[in-house]
């Protein structure tokens, strides 16, 4: 897409003076500034106006543009001015914040503010995560200094109001811009935005008003928490500032793996090894669950991969929406290190059965054969 003529963009003639260019730019930039104009395409027009002004307000760039237009043989006016300049060192965004009142409001440094949140990682056993528990944790956190009551000043003294900002925590900074002089507000570097100067600092906290301590906190872990979930403990974060509320503590859970169980949501999965005889003849076996051992009937002819479900033997939903199930997957164990007698028995079994698979296995092998024959 070809660029429009810069003079056309600003609506001025090629003989326009600097003042005329500046006046046109101020009018158009106010019209299309994104903080003022919410119409579609206003942002692009604003960038176009800004780019045109950057080119025509500089004598050297204007002369090059008048000679070469947009196709500059030097690949841009001394490094380019395609909307990315900073207007010679003054903050463009600050200018419009001052003009249009769209800047971020500075907070009152003496206003109450909530303390910072804290995070603590807790490692749980598989069982503790499933059933929940009450425990005590110890966390390092900042607390208000008891000696100075959080003021940072030596007992018997008070912080002075900052003489540079008058206690506001902000300074007015005057800048020269294309629109004239603009006043911006900055954080006072003398008091670091607090509005106060502490001349006689508390010896215990060094003037910060805070001290590091280890705090013991009772935590109730709900049943059913899972790895990566977190628990919010209100009011147990860092203390507030200027009488504001304390932050919160977030306890993040890491659940250790179990040697027998695996978890998927509220359901539990485990593998049950069976001997060849148990799988072939059937049996009644004891299955471990989180809630104790239960008896499970294994029907004759059970194959590897067969699944059984124990309803209600999983994990309680952490939000109270019922209970999960336990899923048992059978794995038939092939015997190894057989004695001579055992080998003879298996050979005899093979001879009696004719070394042929049963009906279920026959149907499977038939399907394989048909697949190879292309049937």
Swiss-Prot record:
Cofactor: Zn(2+)
GO CC annotation, single: cytoplasm
Gene3D superfamilies linked to this entry: DnaJ domain, Heat shock protein DnaJ, cysteine-rich domain, Urease metallochaperone UreE, N-terminal domain
Keywords: Chaperone, Cytoplasm, DNA replication, Metal-binding, Repeat, Stress response, Zinc, Zinc-finger
Pfam families cross-referenced by the UniProt entry: DnaJ, DnaJ_C, DnaJ_CXXCXGXG
InterPro entries: DnaJ, DnaJ_C, DnaJ_domain, DnaJ_domain_CS, HSP40/DnaJ_pept-bd, HSP_DnaJ_Cys-rich_dom, HSP_DnaJ_Cys-rich_dom_sf, J_dom_sf
Domain J span(s) in chain numbering: 5-69
Binding site for Zn(2+) 1: 145, 148, 202, 205
Stated role: Participates actively in the response to hyperosmotic and heat shock by preventing the aggregation of stress-denatured proteins and by disaggregating proteins, also in an autonomous, DnaK-independent fashion. Unfolded proteins bind initially to DnaJ; upon interaction with the DnaJ-bound protein, DnaK hydrolyzes its bound ATP, resulting in the formation of a stable complex. GrpE releases ADP from DnaK; ATP binding to DnaK triggers the release of the substrate protein, thus completing the reaction cycle.
Protein name as it appears in the record: Chaperone protein DnaJ
Species whose genome carries this gene: Bacillus velezensis (strain DSM 23117 / BGSC 10A6 / LMG 26770 / FZB42)
Native organism taxonomy: Bacteria, Bacillati, Bacillota, Bacilli, Bacillales
